[in-house]
Amino acid sequence: MPLEALVTRWEDRREIQNLMGRYTYALLLKQEKDIFDIYWCQNAEAPCLGLNSGYYKGYGAIQSYYEARHQKNLLRTRLIMQDFSSQTEGKSADELYGCGVLDHKPLGNQVIEIAGDGRTAKGFWYVVGKEDEYGVSGPLSYWTFGMFGVDFVWEDGQWRIWHLTYV
C-alpha cells in the first residue's frame, strides 16, 4: 500500500477515535439535544441505533430517541429542583440541566477497520462505565458493562455515525 494511502487510513482511524470520544462526552455532558445533528450521518441510507432498551430505524426514530432523552433530563432537573429547593434556590432549570446524573462510558479495547474504498468503516469498543440516576425513589448508582459496535460513513468531508449498537 502506498505511503499516502497508509497515512490517510491512519488519519481516518484517528478521526473515528475522536468522533466516538466526542460522542461519549456529549452523552456525559447531557447534550442529547444536539447529538443527532453533530455526530450522525444525514444522507446515508437506513441509519439505525440499537440499545438494550430498543431499536431505532431511520432518521426520525433516532432523532426521537435523543429528544426523549433530552425531555427526561428536563423532567429530572425539575424533580431535583423540587426535592432540593433550598440548595437550588436562585438557579434556573437551564443552569441545573443534567445535574444529579452521571452517565460515563469510557472507551477501551478499540478495533477500527477502514473499508478498502475509504467510504465506510467499522469500529468496536468495550465499555466499563458508571451511571448515577436520580428519580422519585432517590439516588441510584450502578456499574455498566457493554460494547459499542459502530458503522461509520464518510459524508460531506467527515466521518459520521451510520449504525450504532450499544449493548
Enumerate the predicted regions with their spans.
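A structural signal for alpha-helical segments
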Residues: 11, 54-57, 140
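Short beta-strand segments enriched in hydrophobic/aromatic residues
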Residues: 27, 40, 127-129, 165-166
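Short, low-complexity N-terminal intrinsically disordered segments enriched in polar/charged residues
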Residues: 1-42
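A solvent-exposed, acidic/Ser-Thr-rich amphipathic alpha-helical stretch
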Residues: 32-128
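Short, hydrophobic/aromatic alpha-helical segments in well-folded domains
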Residues: 19-22, 108, 147-151
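Short beta-strand edge/turn micro-motifs at domain boundaries
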Residues: 120-124, 143-167
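Short, glycine/acidic-rich beta->alpha junctions
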Residues: 15, 104, 142-144
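Short, cysteine-centered beta-strand-loop-beta hairpins and adjacent loop/turn segments enriched
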Residues: 129-141
